[in-house]
Swiss-Prot record:
Disulfide feature: none
Recorded family membership: Belongs to the KAE1 / TsaD family.
Enzyme Commission code: 2.3.1.234
Gene: tsaD
CDD domains assigned: ASKHA_NBD_TsaD_bac
SUPFAM superfamilies: Actin-like ATPase domain (SSF53067)
Catalyzed chemical reaction(s): L-threonylcarbamoyladenylate + adenosine(37) in tRNA = N(6)-L-threonylcarbamoyladenosine(37) in tRNA + AMP + H(+)
Record's keyword terms, sorted: Acyltransferase, Cytoplasm, Iron, Metal-binding, Transferase, tRNA processing
Protein name per UniProt: tRNA N6-adenosine threonylcarbamoyltransferase
């Protein structure tokens, strides 16, 4: 079974084709980073217009890459939420229209389920059950996962997501959008002993997160210590260490609560090398395993949507005629299969 996946939830246009027997056949991605860089963040209207321009050409490119024709596709999966409503509507409209024209099922996919299942594309996929750390620009959540659609929210950010905090702090440090990866690179030259940032909400029970205060702490530290290159690197290091340590503390608590031996991390921030090393050490000490996707499948992409769509389609999921998206969509509302 071959499924075409379309991702347009924010500022990346992703299209991929996944075959349930042979794996990923094609993967095309267009990033809008340069488009939004001058504005310091994603402009929803510009994002939607660029998706309109890029989605169909990327679908054509994916079919060429896979050496397939329209008649070879068995289903069309598209991101139906959460995300920017205009951007979502572009992918949903194109996906639903193609499914109707090709007389194949259309499968609406939850963006975060796509991220959660992305490690399944690797050679050593995780087995159920596991704790999932979903950490991106829009979400920071800990999820108990016992099967497809069997998701229980353990904790989440009460304000900024970790990725959002990275980008905002990077902006304070004078880095261009998107600043998170640049902040991490800057942190490599930082002195880990110079500044100590707080580990928010780790001094109390619970699995929720809060990262907005770290941005404020960074701003105050910058004002108090100047803005030379080394100071900025030291602040970046202290900030990254605080975020990574906070995530690790909460992951340990979630593993203790569930008793699971496997940890999956997914989302854009899961590509962070410091976080990968830290959680790898955590799981090694516990005699468990940590799983994550290759870096290109951590950020938004069509491959994760095609895969998640293939899993749902194999269990009978499809949408009737009509287009609907959900800018807000709790993961726990998804049906189990």
């Amino acid at each position: 079974m071959r499924v075409l996946g379309i991702e347009t939830s924010c500022d990346e246009t992703g299209v991929a084709i996944y075959d349930t027997e042979t794996g990923l056949l094609a993967n095309q991605l267009y990033s809008q980073v340069k488009l939004h860089a001058d504005y310091g963040g994603v402009v929803p209207e510009l994002a939607s217009r660029d998706h309109v321009r890029k989605t169909v050409p990327l679908i054509q490119a994916a079919l060429r890459e896979a050496g397939l024709q329209a008649g070879d596709i068995d289903g069309v999966a598209y991101t139906a939420g959460p995300g920017l409503v205009g951007a979502l509507l572009v992918g949903a409209t194109v996906g639903r229209s193609l499914a109707f024209a090709w007389d194949v099922p259309a499968i609406p996919v939850h963006h975060m389920e796509g991220h959660l299942l992305a490690p399944m594309l690797e050679d050593n996929p995780p087995a159920f059950p596991f704790v999932a750390l979903l950490v991106s620009g829009g979400h920071t959540q800990l999820i108990s996962v016992t099967g497809i659609g069997e998701y229980r929210l353990l904790g989440e950010s009460i304000d900024d997501a970790a990725g959002e905090a990275f980008d905002k702090t990077a902006k304070l440090l004078g880095l261009d959008y998107p600043g998170g990866p640049m902040l991490s690179k800057m942190a490599q030259a930082g002195d880990s002993q110079r500044f100590t940032f707080p580990r928010p909400m780790t001094d109390r029970p619970g699995l929720d997160f809060s990262f907005s205060g770290l941005k404020t702490f960074a701003a105050n530290t910058i004002r108090s210590n100047g803005d030379d290159d080394q100071t900025r690197a030291d602040i970046a290091r202290a900030f990254e260490d605080a975020v990574v340590d906070t995530l690790a503390i909460k992951c340990r608590r979630a593993l203790d609560e569930t008793g699971f031996k496997r940890l999956v991390m997914a989302g854009g921030v899961s590509a962070n090398r410091t976080l990968r090393q830290c959680l790898g050490d955590v799981m090694a000490k516990r005699g468990g395993e940590v799983f994550y996707a290759r870096p290109e499948f951590c950020t938004d992409n069509g491959a994760m949507i095609a895969y998640a769509g293939s899993v749902r389609l194999a269990h009978g999921a499809s949408q009737t005629l009509g287009v609907s998206v959900r800018p807000r969509w709790p993961l726990a509302e998804l049906p189990a299969v």
